[in-house]
Amino acid sequence: VELTGSNGWKIGGMVKGSGMIAPQLATMLCVITTDAVVSAGQMQAALAVAAEHSFNRIDVDGCMSTNDTVLLLASGASGVEPDKDEFNKLVREACVSLSRQIIGDGEGASHDIRITVTGATSEDAALACGRAVAASNLLKCAISGNDPNWGRIVSSLGTVPPEVAPYDSNKVTVDVNGVRICENGGAGRDRSEVDMTCLLYT
């Protein structure tokens, strides 16, 4: 991936590894470089936030490894000191792009699923719910068979301890690619209306 800042500075990166990819520890090596003039402290802060919202949230096979490295290097060759917010934004965009490419390269991968949780009591609660859905082998089987089975999504939420993510099952709504197949804990539109040939948004 290569991105360009408003003053002409650039940031780019490459990543290797798409097996043993699970949140926070994975068999992967990622190197991101920039020609911007930035301090080590600024790079560390930007990368920590970016990694938390990209590499630390992807899951290919549910298996972890300790061989996990993401590097951000700056040469300063452009002579440009970028706006801090823009730098943070582009670091995050680079990490998100690279992490999604890992997903696409997963061994035997046939579907790319993006899970968004709204209405949770906290970000930690939302993350716990999202990871429970992503880890569901029953859901993976359903998706592999091009069946957006909302019951398996809802049941996976039940594996999250209520003290971690309290919720009312009668208020759960599930949309898949813009089609509301579950509303207030019950059946919504027919799941046959969901287009399963494209990137899945749940």
In which residue ranges do the predicted regions lie?
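Acidic, glycine-rich loop-and-beta core segments that form the ion-binding/anion-interacting portion
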Residues: 42-98
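C-terminal hydrophobic structural anchor segments
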Residues: 139, 143-197
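Conserved small/polar residues in nucleotide/adenosyl-binding loops
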Residues: 201-202
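Short glycine-rich or small-residue beta-strand-to-loop segments that form or flank ligand, phosphate
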Residues: 12-15, 29-34, 70-75, 112-119
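A glycine- and small/hydrophobic-rich beta-loop-beta segment
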Residues: 76-145
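Glycine-rich, mobile lid/loop segments that gate access to catalytic sites or pores
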Residues: 1-53
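Short acidic, glycine/serine/threonine-rich loops at helix termini
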Residues: 22-27, 43, 126-128, 154-155, ...
